[in-house]
């Protein structure tokens, strides 16, 4: 029973990932694309978490940590780019 619920959750999350990916590609503004990309990262972390529960393993926990760190740094860098036009200040 629990396995079938997890499979349904994976299908719903796959649809959510697809919608976030499409929104990232065709977002009307840069801010919409950043939010969609951040949401994509969060959904991907949840998707991997459900796979970990389905396989009853902790083997992907490092992958989840790396994706979360990259998503955080990426959203901060893109937000700074929108605000100032540059990511790194040189002076």
UniProtKB/Swiss-Prot annotation:
<keyword id="KW-1133">Transmembrane helix</keyword>
<keyword id="KW-0406">Ion transport</keyword>
<keyword id="KW-0050">Antiport</keyword>
<comment type="function">
    <text>Mnh complex is a Na(+)Li(+)/H(+) antiporter involved in Na(+) and/or Li(+) excretion and Na(+) resistance. Na(+)/H(+) antiport consumes a transmembrane electrical potential, and is thus inferred to be electrogenic. Does not transport K(+), Ca(2+) or Mg(2+).</text>
</comment>
<comment type="subunit">
    <text>Forms a heterooligomeric complex that consists of seven subunits: MrpA, MrpB, MrpC, MrpD, MrpE, MrpF and MrpG.</text>
</comment>
<keyword id="KW-0812">Transmembrane</keyword>
<feature type="transmembrane region" description="Helical">
    <location>
        <begin position="34"/>
        <end position="53"/>
    </location>
</feature>
<dbReference type="GO" id="GO:0005886">
    <property type="term" value="C:plasma membrane"/>
</dbReference>
<comment type="similarity">
    <text>Belongs to the CPA3 antiporters (TC 2.A.63) subunit F family.</text>
</comment>
<keyword id="KW-0739">Sodium transport</keyword>
<keyword id="KW-0915">Sodium</keyword>
<feature type="transmembrane region" description="Helical">
    <location>
        <begin position="5"/>
        <end position="27"/>
    </location>
</feature>
<dbReference type="GO" id="GO:0015385">
    <property type="term" value="F:sodium:proton antiporter activity"/>
</dbReference>
<feature type="transmembrane region" description="Helical">
    <location>
        <begin position="63"/>
        <end position="82"/>
    </location>
</feature>
<dbReference type="Pfam" id="PF04066">
    <property type="entry name" value="MrpF_PhaF"/>
</dbReference>
<dbReference type="InterPro" id="IPR007208">
    <property type="entry name" value="MrpF/PhaF-like"/>
</dbReference>
<keyword id="KW-0375">Hydrogen ion transport</keyword>
<protein>
    <recommendedName>
        <fullName>Na(+)/H(+) antiporter subunit F</fullName>
    </recommendedName>
</protein>
<keyword id="KW-0472">Membrane</keyword>
<keyword id="KW-0813">Transport</keyword>
<keyword id="KW-1003">Cell membrane</keyword>
């Amino acid at each position: 029973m629990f396995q079938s619920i997890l499979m349904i959750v994976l299908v719903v999350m796959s649809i959510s990932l697809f919608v976030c990916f499409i929104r990232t590609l065709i977002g009307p503004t840069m801010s919409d694309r950043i939010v969609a990309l951040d949401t994509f990262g969060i959904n991907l972390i949840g998707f991997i978490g459900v796979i970990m529960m389905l396989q009853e393993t902790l083997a992907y926990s490092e992958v989840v940590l790396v994706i979360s760190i990259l998503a955080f740094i990426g959203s901060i860098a893109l937000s700074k780019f929108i605000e100032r036009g540059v990511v790194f200040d040189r002076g």
